[in-house]
Curated annotation (Swiss-Prot):
TM helices/strands, residue ranges: none
Composition bias type Low complexity, residue spans: 363-377
GO CC annotation: CCR4-NOT complex; cytoplasm; nucleus
Gene symbol of the encoding locus: cnot10
Lineage: Eukaryota, Metazoa, Chordata, Craniata, Vertebrata
Major location (coarse): cytoplasm
Organism: Danio rerio
Protein name as it appears in the record: CCR4-NOT transcription complex subunit 10
Length: 624
């Protein structure tokens, strides 16, 4: 502390006296008294910076020539950083769990889940992740219980975190009930999620005017990405497809594809909507059961001139109109062909040596967002291998190599079916042959591949090649395939509790057994023999097939084939009895009466029996 302020020019006698007293008190160590004098002096002369400097020196000596303010600030910062690091560790564990779930690595996910629960406790994000884990293992009831135990009311809300927990809660319930086969209930939950999402978007605003732009100023950037409408529409579309409402599903998926146009699965689902909407409204096609109304169209005339008019088996595209372009998004077979072409183009280049079948899957939203994408199984697939490349398929989880190959099989099967429906037999044959050349193919798709190839060949007058495809020995398996996720789950779980039943059933449109599939092959083989006028072989195939299945499972096309064979054999009365009883009857050989019947015009272009099965793979739900 300097005393030169006493000699400063312009100071009054009072100021000099106070300054002298302050200096004397400082020299004697009376720092408190010195500070009082300096305060009084500063009131007298507020513009002198030397007074402020002397006060600082006095305070420094008063504290023992040390200062603790920096240490206190450092300690506070250290505590703050420690809390931030702990929060970051918790977030990192959550992100690792989500990454393992996307990679379908349940073993690593199980270990990481424990770290999440230790660091985050029973917070909503941690419980959502654990529920997701149990959901992937097939423990659906436990997953629902964990979701219900989460206290979503404590979550800060979408305006602070960018995550609408209520929306994710309803979406996750919808995913779980989808996996349990309760599609109507799952659709209800998805609609609730859409309502919550719309409410959140209304809170944030759309930014279309100046007021909304000002409103965004206090909202974090992540909150602007809280809209999950298109993911939820994707989920709703898949649920509607399973319920049997393809047109409503088509509308939902068309909105989703505007955002996720690079997802090949989504294009396949759109094609399946078109196929289902155009399959026909007859009950026998939908349920696989014969109907007399599907055979007899009308009865005309009376008495001796009474005639039975048989129904035409040609299918018509009731959705598509010739006046509009096929590129217009309408649920038509023409648009289905475009969707399937897009799906094939979006798949990576085929690698035959390591191709693996695919399992489609439905992703599950976690604490970071609502991810969806319902997918289905079509063929068997293997376990995850190290080095697998993942193909992006937003909004669902990335596709592994075996999933890509299985997806390719499904697209090829649908493409062959659509090409046949459109009369493009060369393209149908091309797709069917590509399907049959896939390295790993499920029994059901192999069965369909042979049927579609045979039908295309018959239309191209390649009956001999078609007969080779229709050999019943080609059918040795009609399984829909085992998902890679189910295999992973089995290997990860070890001796843990068994997976509960999901409630899903094998779809009716697939053959229930190998014998049923071979019977369908024989029905079609009989049609092929008919075209070569080998009626005895056709009759043997027909009755052999009829003996392999229940009477109610015989398709109406097979009954019409039996009528045609009896007419060719001259057994008019037996043909009438087959129509009246709507079932095949033992053939009776006539006497030596000549066979004067010509081949009816309506049977000159007899097609193989249209398989009851459909290539659309959405009828079976499969997990990742």
């Amino acid at each position: 502390m300097k005393h030169d302020i006493a000699s400063s020019p312009g100071m009054s006698d009072l100021e000099k006296e106070v300054a002298t007293n302050a200096f004397e008190a400082f020299k004697t160590g009376s720092y408190d008294e010195s500070l009082k004098y300096l305060d009084n002096l500063q009131e007298l002369n507020k513009e002198d910076y030397k007074i402020t400097m002397n006060k600082t020196v006095t305070e420094f000596y008063k504290s023992g020539q040390t200062t603790s303010s920096t240490n206190k600030e450092s300690a506070a910062l250290k505590a703050e950083f420690t809390a931030m690091i702990e929060a970051a560790k918790s977030k990192m564990h959550q992100y690792k769990v989500r990454a393992y779930i996307q990679m379908k690595s349940l073993k690593a996910c199980k270990r990481e889940i424990k770290s999440v629960m230790n660091t985050s406790g029973n917070s909503a994000p941690s419980l959502f992740l654990k529920s997701n884990f149990e959901y992937l293992r097939g423990n659906y009831r436990k997953a629902v219980k964990l979701l219900n135990s989460s206290n979503i009311a404590e979550h800060p809300g979408p305006l602070k975190t960018g995550e609408c927990v209520r929306c994710m809660f309803w979406n996750n319930l919808g995913c779980i009930h989808f996996a349990m086969g309760k599609h109507n209930l799952g659709l209800f939950y998805f609609k609730k999620a859409l309502q919550e999402n719309d409410h959140t978007c209304a809170q944030i605003g759309d930014g279309s005017n100046a007021q909304a732009s000002k409103k965004f100023s206090g909202i974090p950037m992540c909150a602007l990405l809280a809209n999950k409408r298109y993911e939820l529409l994707y989920n709703c579309g898949i649920q509607l497809l399973h319920i049997g409402r393809p047109l409503a599903a088509f509308e939902c998926l068309m909105e989703a594809v505007q955002v996720y146009h690079s997802n090949p699965r989504l294009w396949l689902r759109l094609a399946e909507c078109c196929i289902t909407a155009n399959k026909g409204s007859s009950e026998q096609e939908t349920k696989g059961l014969p109907s007399k109304k599907g055979i007899v169209q009308a009865v005309v005339g009376q008495g001796y001139h009474r005639k039975i008019v048989l129904a035409s088996q040609s299918t018509q595209n009731t959705i598509y109109s010739e006046a509009q372009s096929a590129a217009i998004p309408v649920a038509s077979m023409e648009f289905a062909a475009i969707c399937l072409r897009n799906a094939l183009l979006l798949l990576p280049e085929h690698q035959q040596h390591d191709s693996k079948p695919d399992n489609g899957s439905k992703s599950y939203s976690q604490s970071g967002g609502t991810e969806s994408g319902s997918e289905t199984s079509d063929a068997c697939s293997g376990k995850t291998q190290e080095g697998d490349k993942f193909i992006p398929a937003a909004p669902s989880s990335p596709l592994r190599k075996q999933e890509v190959e299985n997806l390719r099989c499904s697209i090829l099967a649908c493409s062959a079916y659509v090409a046949l429906a459109l009369g493009d037999n060369l393209m149908a044959l091309n797709h069917a042959e590509k399907l049959l050349h896939q390295a790993k193919l499920s029994g059901s798709l192999k069965f369909l591949g042979h049927l579609y190839a045979a039908e295309a060949l018959i239309s191209l007058d390649g009956i001999s090649d078609a007969i080779a495809h229709l050999n019943p020995e080609n059918v040795t398996d009609v399984s829909l395939g085992v998902s890679s996720s189910e295999q992973d789950q089995g290997s990860d779980k070890g001796d843990l509790e068994p997976v509960e039943s999901s409630g899903k059933q094998t779809p009716l449109c697939y053959p229930s057994s190998v014998s049923s599939a071979r019977a369908t092959m024989l029905f079609n083989l009989g049609s092929a023999y008919c075209l070569r006028s080998e009626y005895e072989k056709a009759r043997k195939c027909l009755h052999q097939a009829a003996s392999m299945v229940n009477t109610k499972e015989i398709p109406p096309e097979a009954i019409l084939l039996g009528v045609y064979l009896e007419l060719q054999n001259g057994n008019t009365q037996l043909a009438l009895q087959i129509i009246k009883r709507n079932q095949l009857l033992p053939s009776v050989k006539p006497g030596s009466s000549p066979d004067f019947r010509k081949k009816p015009l309506s049977f000159q272009s007899t097609q193989p029996v249209q398989p009851i099965q459909t290539p659309s793979s959405f009828t079976q739900v499969q997990r990742k």
